[in-house]
Amino acid sequence: MTSIYSTKFVVREATENDLPACLQLDLSYETEYVWQMDVRDEEGTIAVGFRTVRLPRLMRVVYPREPAGLTIAWQKRDCFLVAETSGVVRGYIVMRVDAGRTNAWVSDLAVGRAWRRQKIGSALLAEAYRWAQKAKLPRLTVETQTKNYPGISFCQKHGLFFCGFNDRYYANHDIALFFAQNVRL
């Protein structure tokens, strides 16, 4: 599978030789907003809500996964795609299929800091969606941190809806948010 999106980049299946380049990408980001979780336990009812909160200053956040995790993801992958320009990797997406074969789970959707806002993430997500269609998976789910407001906005812009969270999901104990989209089969 190779898709040419412009003269700027190509999306293709990753090879093991792409891993070092993926690991070299600067995946940090800056944000002025986060999703803050509010939990209320009143008279036997637990209510959980998220709200957008503006931070007092710009916050730089490092990618939540350890580099060794990408090698493990490569070994366990169902789908691993890269976006490249002139043979240089600019971003990647890693997806696995859940045990019930009902969900294409995007664990990593990453674009190097210098290459953002050039539709690379959109192209990677579009190829992941096509892959899920071909695999006859009815749902595509993307995970991101509550701190990753740019990632949250990206998911919402692409029609994914908030469908859940997991407290202390990442190694650094950040909360994971899950955004999903039904796949037309």
Q: Where do the protein language model's features map onto the residues?
A:
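Conserved acetyl-CoA-binding loop-helix of GNAT-fold acetyltransferases
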Residues: 111, 117-130, 134, 153-157
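Residue-level recognition of the GNAT/N-acetyltransferase active site
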Residues: 112, 143-145
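C-terminal "cap" of GNAT-fold acetyltransferases
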Residues: 3-6, 138, 145-152, 157-158, ...
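Conserved, well-structured beta-alpha core segment at the onset of a catalytic domain
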Residues: 1-17, 84, 89
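Acetyl-CoA-dependent GNAT
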Residues: 16, 24-107, 112-113, 125-127, ...
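A SAM-dependent methyltransferase catalytic signature shared across enzymes that methylate proteins
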Residues: 159-163
